[in-house]
């Protein structure tokens, strides 16, 4: 049995772990490897999110942990997602106690409405609140999700053959970031409530995304198409667009049980872990919005790993990738004892970091804890 170190939130002295084995003792027996207790690490990282970023006066998460109280709509959706991750993993009401406060604060900060100019931002909030509804059965979350879904569907037009636009007033710009999450949302709404129209929306959005913004040979997801010019931006390839395309394929696979969807997800995942990395670790995509990109990929990559019909050799390869990234972040990229993460998972951020970068790190550590709990990661 492997020994595990418990990482406590109040840890004072940084601890370091070695992936390699120690020298074999004189008696010829190898010492046991020391491994990370991902459950404890996730507790530490997710509580840090609350302790260092939560704005108790406004009931939302601040932009950084250094006093910038600027409200950002879409990162707050992912902060709720992390709280739900932690609550589902532990059952600890210390996490769920923030759900209602988040609901009140985020809506108030967004002008006392869930409506927003950016369709992708509304999609992220709808996805997070759909999860909140599932774990609480509180209908206010369901009502908010359905309200948002109504706004989101208004973003579809026939420019560039279909797709949901990125931003109100920019009907010509059709982006992967506004269609991947929308397809996931539509599919999950169908699975939750059984509305056939939602299933058709999921098929339609996914079909447009795959045929328009995905390289069929490599699985790379292109960023956007300008319907005024017909030009596709093939230079911008980001981990979060890869992730939401993977996520939408997995959700449709769950509905139809057709392996073709799983194959789509695998192709996109293989491209990501082969091309958007540095030495097998997801590369930095900067701060600000980019700080969240890797965490979004990790969330939907984890969903793919959990699929029972995923070929065993592929699953093992993906688990090795996850383990390497999580160990690298925890051992090389985490400021201890504060448990802070930066955009580069091989580099500690110091004492200050942004909400988006912290969220991506939290998502990775929570994913490792989930996979460990399911006895997939060892």
Where are these regions (language model features)?
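Sec-dependent bacterial lipoprotein signal peptides
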Residues: 1-17
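Extended ligand-binding groove/face enriched in aromatic
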Residues: 96-192, 199-200
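Bacterial Sec-dependent N-terminal signal peptides
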Residues: 13-40, 44
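Oxyanion-binding "anion nests"
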Residues: 241-256, 260-277
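Alpha-helical scaffold segments in carbohydrate-active enzymes
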Residues: 48, 85, 105, 131, ...
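CBM-like carbohydrate-recognition segments
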Residues: 33-80, 86-120, 132, 136, ...
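Active-site cradle of extracellular carbohydrate-active enzymes
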Residues: 186-189, 198-249
């Amino acid at each position: 049995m492997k020994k595990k170190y418990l990482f406590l939130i109040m840890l004072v002295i940084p601890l370091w772990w070695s992936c390699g084995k120690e020298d074999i003792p004189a008696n010829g027996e190898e010492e046991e490897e020391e491994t990370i207790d991902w459950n404890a690490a996730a507790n530490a990282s997710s509580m840090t999110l609350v302790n260092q970023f939560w704005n108790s006066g406004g009931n939302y998460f601040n932009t950084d942990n250094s006093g910038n109280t600027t409200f950002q709509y879409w990162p707050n959706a992912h902060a709720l997602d992390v709280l739900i991750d932690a609550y589902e993993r532990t059952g600890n009401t210390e996490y769920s106690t923030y759900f209602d406060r988040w609901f009140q604060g985020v809506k108030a900060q967004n002008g006392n409405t869930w409506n927003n100019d950016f369709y992708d931002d509304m999609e992220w909030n709808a996805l997070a609140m759909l999860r909140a509804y599932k774990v609480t059965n509180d209908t206010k979350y369901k009502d908010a999700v359905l309200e948002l879904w109504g706004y989101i569907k208004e973003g579809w037009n026939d420019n560039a053959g279909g797709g949901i636009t990125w931003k109100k007033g920019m009907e010509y710009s059709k982006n992967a970031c506004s269609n991947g999450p929308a397809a996931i949302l539509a599919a999950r709404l169908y699975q939750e409530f059984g509305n056939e129209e939602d299933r058709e929306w999921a098929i339609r959005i996914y079909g447009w995304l795959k045929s328009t913004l995905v390289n069929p040979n490599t699985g790379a997801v292109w960023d956007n198409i300008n319907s005024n010019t017909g030009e596709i931006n093939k230079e911008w390839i980001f981990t979060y667009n890869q992730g939401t395309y993977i996520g939408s394929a997995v959700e449709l696979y769950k509905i139809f049980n057709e392996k073709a969807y799983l194959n789509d997800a695998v192709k996109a995942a293989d491209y990501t872990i082969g091309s958007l990395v540095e030495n097998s670790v997801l590369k930095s995509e900067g701060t600000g919005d980019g700080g969240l990109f890797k965490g979004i990929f990790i969330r939907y990559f984890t969903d793919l790993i959990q699929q029972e019909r995923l070929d065993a050799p592929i699953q093992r390869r993906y688990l090795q990738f996850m383990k390497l990234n999580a160990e690298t972040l925890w051992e090389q990229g985490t400021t201890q004892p504060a448990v802070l993460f930066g955009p580069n998972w091989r580099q500690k951020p110091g004492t200050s970091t942004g909400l988006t970068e912290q969220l991506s790190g939290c998502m990775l550590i929570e994913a490792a804890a989930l996979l460990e709990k399911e006895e997939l990661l060892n």
